[in-house]
Amino acid sequence: MRWVVFLALGAMLAGSASAAAATQCGRLLARLADQVADAACAESTDLTTNNPATTPANNSLPGLPPFAFTPQTDRAVISPTAHTPITKTLSGIQIDGRIAEDPTGEARILFRLPNQWNGKLVVAGASGTRSEFNGDFAWSDYVLQQGYAYVSQNKGILNFYLTTAADPLGCRLNPSSTTFVHFYDNDPGQPFTRWTEFMNEAARIGKNAVAGYYGRYPRRTYAVGTSNGGYQVRRALETAPELYDGGIDWEGTYVDAVAPNLLSALPPAILNYPDYAASGFASSSTAAKNLLVTGYPPDLVSGTSSLWGLYWAQFWEVTLCQWQKRLDPSYDTYGSGTGTYSYVDRLSASDVGADVAAIATTGNIGKPLITVAGTMDALLPINLHARAYARAVTAALSEQSDEGDHDRHRRPAYRLYEVQNGNHIDAYKDIFPQLELIQPHAQHAFDLLTEAVEHGSALPPDQCIPRGGSITASPPQPGHCAGLFVGP
């Protein structure tokens, strides 16, 4: 009889918990009804990626072609093979849906609201053309374990779908490939300016979701992002600093109408790599010297594998095509050539300068920002991106001084932490052990940022993080790394 009572009581409690979860989801979705559409809300016993249900399967959104929505792939892109350690389970609410105001129907947003909340919110950008699940390994698992609520978005775009060479917006995967893809962000109504808009909109909606779930708004809000997501962080702190308390930019994309930018930096790599490969990867070849003088880090070769070769096959040309199709659409991508594209020449032949200026990073940040970048990044070379942005921040602060800004002690802090031998794709360390991971340093920088914002501690100075080292208050190498590569 006692077992019957216990079973009945257990069933009642389970039913009560299920009803409570449904009520919580219902109330939260009702609060977000004007901001989030087609939303799925679920109570999760574990919001970390230890739970297989946390990140949905690739191609799991109905009605979309393959590769348009690839969350499993997306979360692995920016994270090393050794993912963020997970030491606890975190129950809470997860919501995924569309941003209602988006006329294209592509803008998506993700919320993770842990039951054990620290009163703060993290807003995440997305790299490349990746989904709102891009930061699951690198950022979500890290900040959720500290009690942060987490919101992420997809820059207002889906990923891509397979197409043919006949598609005027098609981009081949690399110069040797016969596979063409169509990026959604090259469609009409998808200007790159939306990337900033949806980062800031995610912050606004995220704060509303937090207030609806916990009964109060977050007392602190931080922005984090990698690559194009790092660009989103920069632009967020430049355009809407009132929404944030600080940000971490992990190898963000630098955009300047005068240059450097991707349209100016990628063609020399595309043009010279085939001759370099034909030379047997000879570092003394003219082609290799051309890449180095353009600002690229030295190549690494292991057997038949080349670090430059990985970027040539996976990133350089397809990225140039994606940006050129959006920013300089009148250029004949493959008829005139990708490696021979000249940004300077195109300034007088098209509106590309104005289009790039509309999305440019200004350096005029309104809240503290830390950039973490690797010296061996061969997609966004450090001299052309991280260091260029640091110079832009310095120039913006200098301009404020010239205009008579007397409140200098309240200017937002900026730091550049360079990772010796760090690389854009952490997983490449599996092939080239000489490389160093960026993710641990980006996560450490996040902790340093929050400590500085919340407790007034000084951020460590700009520095080169030596191989095997960490960010320190008294760095052995302040400022820039002396060389882009340190062997063996």
Please describe what each predicted stretch is.
Residues 4-15:
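Bacterial N-terminal signal peptides
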Residues 22-488:
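C-terminal His-loop and adjacent cap/lid subdomain of alpha/beta-hydrolase
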Residues 17-21:
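Sec/Tat signal peptide C-region and signal peptidase I cleavage site
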